[in-house]
């Protein structure tokens, strides 16, 4: 299963470079909590047509299957529960909450925290006492003001959110592409905590 939060290029452009999808024995089910299967298929048809990619990817690969998110939820019933949460991102984005037994993981990438109370409050409700929050750490707090409306959060907001919700572990992801490995190590050391970074 490939579950997409949204369809900005940084999230979809890697699909045709995963050569496993070209093996017809690999059945690839694609869904999103943001749009229907029909709309999702059309997104990928448009994104990977010959003007942007050498072959019409969706029509060429018969092993790609586009389904509604509810289909994946039904398929996963015996394994886990998975639900969506609306995120604040230009064009829309879906976060995901996955639960199995007494374990819960919340994935909140591509969200601009602190702008829409209703969304933020729902995130807090879902993440309270969870096992892992995967957080959008595109920016630092000091970088946020000129980036208002870009749909991303800061590393520090992730740490504060993690503390406020008493989640057990925090994974900061979706870092700025301009951030170097050395800078990421420095931020990790500066924010060292028992819950992880």
Model-derived regions, located:
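Binuclear metal-dependent hydrolase catalytic cores
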Residues: 1-106, 117, 123-124, 181, ...
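Active-site glycine-centered loops adjacent to acidic/histidine catalytic or metal-binding residues
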Residues: 6, 110, 174
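Residue-level signal for short, function-critical loop segments
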Residues: 34, 111, 176
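Short, basic, glycine/proline-bearing loop/turn elements
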Residues: 105-110, 144
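Cap/insert and terminal regions of metallo-dependent hydrolase folds
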Residues: 115-197
């Amino acid at each position: 299963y490939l579950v997409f939060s949204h369809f900005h290029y940084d999230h979809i452009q890697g699909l045709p470079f995963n050569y496993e999808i070209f093996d017809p024995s690999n059945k690839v089910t694609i869904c999103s909590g943001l749009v229907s299967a029909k709309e999702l298929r059309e997104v990928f048809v448009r994104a990977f047509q010959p003007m942007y990619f050498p072959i019409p990817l969706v029509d060429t690969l018969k092993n790609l299957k586009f389904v509604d998110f509810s289909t994946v939820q039904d398929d996963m019933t015996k394994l886990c529960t998975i639900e969506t949460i609306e995120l604040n991102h230009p064009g829309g984005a879906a976060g995901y909450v996955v639960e199995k037994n007494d374990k819960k993981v919340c994935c909140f990438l591509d969200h601009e925290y602190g702008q829409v109370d209703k969304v933020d409050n729902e995130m807090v409700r879902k993440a309270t006492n969870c096992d892992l929050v995967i957080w959008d750490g595109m920016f630092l707090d000091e970088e946020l003001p000129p980036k208002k409306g870009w749909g991303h959060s800061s590393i520090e907001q992730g740490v504060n959110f993690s503390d406020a919700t008493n989640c057990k572990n925090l994974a900061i992801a979706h870092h700025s592409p301009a951030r170097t490995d050395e800078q990421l190590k420095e931020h990790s050391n500066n924010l060292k905590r028992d819950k992880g970074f």
